[in-house]
Amino acid sequence: MLNTQRAQEIAASPIMANVTYQEVPIYIQHVDEQNETARIYPLDNPELEQDVPLSQLMEH
């Protein structure tokens, strides 16, 4: 599970972090602190953007 601060660090970093959502490698585009969600997309399908709870993201 990612906390808000770590998710923001990953989103701002030029280095790709190994983060998954439902076991799928994803890229974090934006973090919404108030709602504790992140705008993400699967690395293999950039057009499939979605907002998900930070609690469902895993850093490996």
UniProtKB/Swiss-Prot annotation:
Pfam families: SspH. It comes from the Bacteria. The keyword Transport does not apply. It is found in: Spore core. Keywords: Sporulation. The keyword Nucleotidyltransferase does not apply. Induction: Expressed only in the forespore compartment of sporulating cells. GO terms for cellular component: endospore-forming forespore. One of its GO terms (biological process) is asexual sporulation. Belongs to the SspH family. NCBIfam families: PRK03174.1, SASP_H. This is Small, acid-soluble spore protein H. It comes from Halalkalibacterium halodurans (strain ATCC BAA-125 / DSM 18197 / FERM 7344 / JCM 9153 / C-125) (Bacillus halodurans). The lineage of its organism: Bacteria, Bacillati, Bacillota, Bacilli, Bacillales. The gene is sspH.
